[in-house]
Each structure stands twice: as C-alpha cells, then as structure tokens.
Amino acid sequence: MEPPLELPTQRKRVIPSKFGILKRNAEIEAEKNRENLQQSSCFSHINEIGKEIGLEIWKIIDDSTIQKVPKVNHSTFETNKSYLLLMGQFYDGNMNIKTYNIHFWIGELLINSQETINFCNDRIEELERIIKYNQKQFDSEQFYPEPILYREFQGKEGDIFMSYFKSYGGPRYVAPLKLTSASAAIATAAKQYKLFHLKGRRNIRVKQVDISSKSLNSGDVFVLDCEDFIYQWNGSESSRLEKGKGLDLTIRLRDEKSAKAKIIVMDENDTDKDHPEFWKRLGGCKDDVQKAEQGGDDFAYEKKSVEQIKLYQVENLNYEVHLHLIDPIGDVYSTTQLNAEFCYILDCETELYVWLGKASANDQRTVAMANAMDLLHEDNRPSWTPIIKMTQGSENTLFKDKFKKGSWGEYVNDNFEKKPITGKGVAAKAVQEKINVDALHNPEKYQLSKEERKSTIPTLHHVDDKHRGELKIWHVRNRNKFEISQSEFGLFYNQSCYLVLFTLFAADGSNNSILYYWQGRFSSSEDKGAAALLAKDVGKELHRSCIHVRTVQNKEPNHFLEHFQGRMVVFKGSRPNATTEVSLENLSSSLQGLYHVRGTEPINIHSIQVEKAISSLDSNDSFILVNFKNTISYIWVGKYSDEKEAALQISSNVFTGYNFQLIDEGDETSEFWESLETNSSLSLLKDYYTQLRTVEQEKKTRLFQCSNNSGVFKVFEIHDFSQDDLDSDDVMILDNQKQIFVWVGKESSDTEKLMANETALEYIMNAPTHRRDDPIFTIQDGFEPHEFTFNFHAWQVNKTQQDSYKSKLSAILGSNNSGPASPIMLPTSGVTLKPTTAATPKPITTPTVTTPKPITTPTVATLKTVTPAVTLKPTTVTTPSKVATTTNTSTPSPTTITTFYPLSVLKQKTNLPNDIDKSCLHLYLSDEEFLSTFKMTKEIFQKTPAWKTKQLRVDNGLF
C-alpha cells in the first residue's frame, strides 16, 4: 500500500510593494546596461572612469585598442598617435557635483587621416556615454552638467587644453621611434638624445625639433635631454616666462628618470669652452645659432586667429535639415537669440561650437553635430579646427565671450528674424570699442557680469556666525593633514595650507559645518591641491551638510576671521613641524619681526608679518615690533590709526611674556628706530607713508585691470584686491579717491600701456565729482612708491621685483641642501650659471626728475588721445624701501661743486652766474646754509625720495 501523499507545507507569500518591484526592475535594467556598455566599449574598468577629480588620458593604439597613460607621462604626446583626455572638476564650487571636459587630440602626422578623426569622434561620444551612465548610477535624481567636447590638433590646442599642463612646462611632442624589435627599442631609447623647443608669450608650447645647433635661436629656450645630463639653453632674448617653463620641463624630465639625471642651465652668452659637452652632443657650435627673428613672433606663434563669427539655428523639419543664419544684435550676438527648443552652431572660423538647448529633440542634436562636421570641411578650413559640443547651462568661458556682456543666461523664446543660407555671408570684422568709463564709475548702473567683476573672495551671506560651535584645524603637509592643538588656533604661516572646520550647533539639536581650506600666499601648488582634496575627504567623513570655502591669504571673509576673536597672525615661512605641537615658547627666537595690524572689531582683527623696516610703517595703522624677550618690544600707533586696541589685543593674546612699550607716532625713542632699522643712515630718514587716509577713502579705493590678451582692449574691476592681483602681463589702474596710479607690468604690451593711460585720463575727466585736478601717476612694476603700496595690506617689498625664473631656480637650489636628490648641478669647472642679457635692466639715461611725476589734467581734456603736453610716463623710477635718486651723468654732485652761493642769490633764478646748473640750485648752498634751510645734510637729502625733495625745493624757492 502506497504511503499517503504528503502535501507541501503552505507558506505565506510575501508580495513586494509596487515601489520595490520598480526599484528591482531598475536595478536589473541598470545591470544589463552596464554589461552591454562594458562588452561594447573599448575602455576597461568603465566604473572607475571619471570617479576622481583630475586628468585622465588614454592613447589610441589602433582601431580596437585604447591604452591608459600613467600620470608620469601625462604631458608626453607622440606625434603619430591620437589621445583622449578627460578632465573632471567640481561644478561651480559644489563639491558634490562634477563637471567634465572631454578632448581628443590628433598628432600632426595624423591630421589628414579622416579614418582616425572618425574613430576619435566615436570614442569621444562613447566616453561621454560612460560619464553620463556613471553619474546616473551615483544619483539618478541629481542634476549633472553635460560634458563639454573638444577637438584638439597638435600645435593648435586651445587655452583650456594648455592649462592642464602648466605645471609640466606645457605639453611635450615626441616624434615616433623607428624600431625593429622590443630590445632594439630599449637600446635606441636609451641612446637617443632629444631636443625640445619652448616658445610662446603666455601659453608656452613645447615641441621636439631636430637635434642640431642650427635649431637654436636667440629668442627662445631649448632643452637637450641626454639621459644622464639635461641641458637647458636660454637664448639671449628669451623671456623669463619661457625660461621658467624650461626649468619646469627639465625637472619633469629628471623626475621621469628617478632623479638620476643632472641638470645644467646655460645661457647663449656662455662660450663654447664653458660647455664643451653640450656642443659635442648637440653637434655644431655657437656660431650656428639663428637670430631671434628666425624663430618668429611669440604672440603670432601662440595666438589663435579669431575672425568672422556666424550663428546658425538648426532645424530638422520633415526629414530636411535647415540652417538659418541669424543676424547679430548690433555688432555682437546676445543670448536672447538662443532658444532652448533648438540647437545652434556658432562658427568662429577657427572654432565651431555646437550648442544644444535643454528642450531640443535628440534627432535635432544629432543633425547639429553632423552639420558642424560639414561646415568643418567647407571653405578650406584648417584641419585642426576644433568642434566643441556643449549643453545649455554648461557653457565655458570661451563660448560666453562671443556674446554680449551682461546678457548671459537671458534665454527667451521671442521670434527673431532668421535668414536661410543662400551664400557666404561676411560678418563685420571685430573692432576696438571705446571704453565706457561711466560704467567704471557706476558699475551697478550697467549690471556688470561676473566675468567682468572678477571677484575672487568667497561669500556666505547665509551663514549665522552668532551661534558658537566647535572648531578644528589641520595643518597640510606632504599630502596629509595633521590636527593642531587649540593653543595654536589663529596662528598661520604664509608658506603653508590649513583646513579649518567650524561646526554650528542649532537649538533643535541639528548642526551644520563650514570647512575652509586656507592657502598661504606663498604655499606650494602641491599643498594647495592636497588641501582641496583633503577638504573633500573631511566633508565625506562628516556625513552631513558641509559648506566648502576656498580661502586665500589676504582675502579672508569676516566669517572666517571671527572664529579667532582677535588672535589671528600670519607669520612668514612654513610651519616648523608637521606632526608635533608648535609652542610659541619654542619659537621665541623666530617670532622677531614687524607685524602689521588691521581691524577695529573682533570679527576682523588680524595681523601679518611684514618686512622689518621703517618703510613698512604707515601713519594710518598700528604695528607690533617683537624683539628678544629680554629686551623691550614695541606697539607703534600711527597718528591716524584706529587699530590701537586691536594691537594691544593681539600682543596680549599671542605674544605673551614679552615686555611691550606703547609708543605713539612722534614720540619714538632712538632705541625704537635702531631696533627697527639696522642701517643707521636710513633710520635717520624715517621714510614711510604719513598722509591721512580716511575710512571712506579706504572703502572707495578701486583697482582695475587693463588687458589686451584677447585681441581687444578691456578694462574690468578687481574687487577685494591684494598685491597678488597685480599681473605683470597687464596694466593696472588704482583709484584711491585722491590720485590715480597707472601701474605698468613688466610684460605688458605697448597697446596696453597707451590705452590704459588714455583710459585713466578719460576716467578722471568723467568722474561724477569734480576731480579734474587729481594727479595721475605712472609707475613701473617693481618700483612702487609709498603712495601706491599703502593701498595694499602687508605689501611684500621684494615680490614684484622678483624674476619668476630666478626665484624658481633659487628655490630649487635651496632645496638641494634638504632634498634627497640634487635637482640642479652647477659644475665647479667650466660650467657656470650666468644671467642672460635680456634679464639685465637697461640703464636710465634720462635727466633727474621727480618720481613718480604727477599729471595735472587740463581744463579741457582730450578724450581719445593723450596730448604730447601730458606726459604720463615717468622718466625715472625709485625702489620702494630704500629710495635713491637717479642722476644724469652731466648733473653735478655735491662733491664736484666747489663754489657756493647764498640762498637769496639762488632764489632770483635770473641773472645767475654762468657756472650754475639751474636743475640743481640747492646743491650750490653751503653745507651750513643747506642744513639750516632743509633741516638735513646733503648726504641725507640725496637719499630722500625724489617726490619729497621736489616739494622741499619748491617750498624754499629752489625748483
């Protein structure tokens, strides 16, 4: 008999919710998409692509193989290959959203290969799909900007592409090696020398050239890589920027060889005997070097030609594609002509932009790219012309610059006239527009765009600083962070970076955090980058809302300063020890110096260490002079200063244990001057800024940057400025409501100098208040007088006088003593490092005049040109700290004059004896009468700034 059938035990069936089913289905679909993408993709590890911030590069080996390039070779490009580049960055300061630029780069040997270009087009679109897929997997509901696509060709790369390789000295082009086997490749690479040519004005390009002495020219820099030795050859007319980038390249080459190669820096003026090995390896001699003209113009070599600009609207109607040419509004296009429902092609002759409206259809986007490719092949356009695709809301600065300023983001759907293409339209050539000085005086009236404002200081108006919270600070060094103790809070170093985390506790128990990553003024690029990355890591560890604020020294917002309650001091140098606590007791010997105090309330009190010199003083501020503990230190209060209480607060909070004496300006003792200035002759001069600067004047002091680097002269204001905003490539205009300064950068062009002077004149003539009698001073980069420098907090005297190439070289030479490897070798015999003739300043041969020379504008001014009678350029310059007059070789000196005359005779100015030089009447006074008249000796008078001596001579009738 069969056993009874056992029924299975019934179980409750769990029915998943509708949302659970949808979620699971979405996960299954995403997994299928990932597998399909992985199987069809030429890229490996697609889940890792774009995960980290920074640059990723792939080399295209053939039509089916793509190889990722290690970071050590990121700046090297083979001229017979093509590359794909992906740059990930944070979007608009938001650490949770990334934006991507995708480039494909074609070497010069493949420029005419249409197959390669088509393959790169496919791969760049594939990379775009991978990025979008990974973004969706991270957060499907989050808005992500569309990746921007670029085409690049060797030697014609855009500014964005070039910016990725500034730290490498620019991209390096390498010719392909003709090898027969792998072993031969290794042997040949070890023996082959390479010669690199560096050229450009702002974006230095590096190109491999023929190894021959005839490849050298006097206007550029060349680097010869011989594996065991790396030679940098500086042409006599090469720029300091080219030499600095050359040094970056040589160090990069050395690091690729594990620091085994030795670097030798040489100049064209060195003889063949100084560097025999260099000429032996290069082949030839010094006589083969070409003139600078043979290398071509730097600006022409680098600058892209921006010619006619046309805007097309793409329409796909009834399977027919139409391109409609849109007329500009006036001379330029406006974003009000862009409709979110359509796609557009912006044709700039040497650039093609494809703009995709957010509401445009997919088929319209496809035909827009296809039509851009068609335009690319018309009119014999250069093969290196890039096609850049971008979506509404993710436009880059280069694209925005093509449209009317102030209109960006004003998208409307109004109808506008569209003209079908019937022929080749010719757009009007771009012309220089007159600078609107009324917009400079009244920026709110014209609603200047963010690009023109160029404000670099972060603002957090929504942060409530009234609540107290928890403060943590880390010091950044060697890519790691080290937490510091509370006793060190508020003490910073200008060569270091810090993370400052402030947590706000609300009454309801919730909390929010603000994370500042503070960058010292002279901190290294490595520490700055590490601070940004470590800030990202700290934000992730918090697991809550966190605002990230990049904070630069001298541009700290009040909500940052308030955390330290009058205890913030910035010292010179770097923090002595990374891992252990820094005690002020242990640092007492290194604290000696002069500290400039600013701030009148706890929320803005701070102090910065400045040069210990009398010239650093300012009657409008207070200073702390710290000496040894067993001696007297001083708190010096200027006669117009409001910072007395702030200086007392910092001295008691920070410099504890020191014996301070409070001194008002005018009551200084001889001991004070001697401890401040070791040079006894300068201590007698007491040369510093003594004029009144009102609070209203401080608030209204404004700085404008004048630049012609885009081909059109532009003027824009820099808000919350500091000394670091002075760009040696441009001309700056400073208005402190009393006078106008035209600051001329060392590398500024003649056009910038001329038009900046014209702009300054128009600016003063069109001021809302009567300012026609205000003087205009023209001063040179590196020779700023006190009247100019007092407008900047903690002016660094030597900063503008430093040569970037020399300072960089000095820094590397200084690291020889502490670093494991020797970056630069200076042989003891036969090889020396000499300055080029280009770096030697030309002697001044103009007559002695005042410096700087004020300009009193006439009642009726010329608005377009500067009349010859108005001399804006000074004929002499003086150093800011230790001023000396510049004399003509024909002008008598006090030691050469033997005949003296009384003051009454010299004041007549007519019927003077024939042996008197009227340009220096004061020198013909006897020593006794000179001292009685000017209250100083002739020797001290000669060392007094020219602007002071002029006024003294005028007051006594001897000018």
UniProtKB/Swiss-Prot annotation:
Segments of this protein annotated with the region Tail: 1-53
PROSITE patterns in UniProt: HP
Gelsolin-like repeats: 64-116, 204-244, 309-366, 479-529, 603-647, 713-754
Gene Ontology CC terms: actin cytoskeleton; cytoplasm
Compartment(s) of residence: Cytoplasm, Cytoskeleton
Sequence repeats: 840-849, 851-860
Boundaries of every HP domain copy: 895-959
Listed CDD domains: gelsolin_S2_like, gelsolin_S3_like, gelsolin_S4_like, gelsolin_S5_like, gelsolin_S6_like
Keyword Cell inner membrane carried by entry: no
Keywords of the record: Actin capping, Actin-binding, Cytoplasm, Cytoskeleton, Repeat
Primary location group: cytoplasm
Stretch list, region 2 X 10 AA repeats of T-P-K-P-I-T-T-P-T-V: 840-860
Core: annotated span: 54-832
Keyword Ribosomal protein included in the entry's annotation: no
GO biological process: actin filament severing; actin polymerization or depolymerization; barbed-end actin filament capping
GO molecular function: actin filament binding; actin monomer binding; phosphatidylinositol-4,5-bisphosphate binding
UniProt function note: Caps actin filaments but displays neither severing nor cross-linking nor nucleating activities. Protovillin seems to be a villin precursor with only archaic capping activity. It lacks essential changes in the sequence to allow bundling of actin filaments and consequently the appearance of microvilli.
Assigned protein family: Belongs to the villin/gelsolin family.
Stated name of the protein: Protovillin
Species for this entry: Dictyostelium discoideum (Social amoeba)
